[in-house]
Amino acid sequence: SNGKESYSSAEKEESGQPLQSASISASSSVESAELAESANAGYPTLKEVAQNYNGCALEYPNMEELSVGMLYGDSGNRYCLFDVDGRVHHVFESDTYIASGFYNGMCMTSTRVMAKEDGTLFRPSYLSNDEIIIRYAKDDDGTLLWTVRREDSIEGTKAIITAWDTNGEIRFQCDTTRDEFSKMNSDTVYKDLANNDYDSIGISQAFAYCGGSVYRIRSDFYYVFMNIDTEKFFSVREPNAYLIQAEGNLMIRTMPGLRALDDDFNELPEWEAIKSRRSETPVLSEGLIYLDVRRDADDFEDYPSGFYDVHLNQVIDLSQYNIQSIYEDEPRFINGYAVLQMKNPEGVPFWGVIKRDGTWAAEPQKGSVRYVYQTAEGVLITTCEENIEQWYTYDQTGTKLDEWDRIKFDGSYGYAQDSSSGNRGICEVYNGYTYASLNSHVAKISSDGSYEYLS
């Protein structure tokens, strides 16, 4: 039968069943993979469903439970939920916009309500009516649902910000009566958070995740950063941008000016008067950061191009190379490998892969890198020859993958973020495979570069 028929019959069967029997939630213990497989067998495959569409993309991966995909159609796009075997559990109506990954039996829609596996819209029972959902994501501290509500009294208005864990217990809570919020207007904070733009990672975003256990609130020109593990807060007024990246218990500030911070958000003294020679934003990854900086103080000091730790100790010297960003993405380590885009003295582009010990995993070769994707053991690098649409894909050793000729990743150029970064991850490494969008299909890719399409 064609995909349409089998799908609609599966939909009819599914609608007659209670939700529990139709699905196995990730939290229940599955005795065996066969049991899960048989429970999912009633669902149509992504390949069957995608036949009626022009293509499919991975939007919010969570292969452990269900992933959010996007089906592209002439009459509009539709979100869907599918499992690791590529079976489609639900296709949403075209007017439903999914704005988070699917965790613990639910995902968030753009109208600030949650959707179940069968598409039912609901609000978690532990939320009072005046709580507005502002973020739902799986971050380093686990899956958290963030809300804001306001309390008005004759003394004044306050906004209360709460993070709920998957049991509906309060994991973290604070309100705008804290000193750090004293320069902000509580009414404005509430309105900014209630209208938070959930899927952008822009400077003006009212509520943002910075990595690690650090979150940020922005209102007017004030920022409040909070570490929900240490319960430490930090506030600052900055008319431009104030950006912090956290990795584990390490933090760097990338704007205004480059600094490393301690657990209390104090600047580390060794970063005093440091100025970058590059316009791109560096990235702290696997404890190292690529820098080309100088100290503009009485004792002028040079920190040439290379990888450094957060105390400005140079780990790898790259000063003999002309290091380029990859579409504004600076070099970073992924699985112990850093992909470097370089130019020779005549301006010809070369790329190579360096290991943490500073030796080459892949010697420099000609080409311009377009994509870098994480695999279970290394990275995949897609290059494109200048002026001709000829795509090549390599592993971290520089070995060309012949079966990848003329196919490429979908999405914007640069480094693909694993979904664990809390941002809109466009790939996920799960059980030894990378799941990503490839040539308008959802693909399952192994570390050796072999792949299969799920859609």
Regions found by a protein language model. Give the residues of each.
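Residue-level detector of conserved, function-critical positions
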Residues: E37-S455
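Gram-positive cell-envelope targeting signals
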Residues: S1-S27, E31-E34, S38
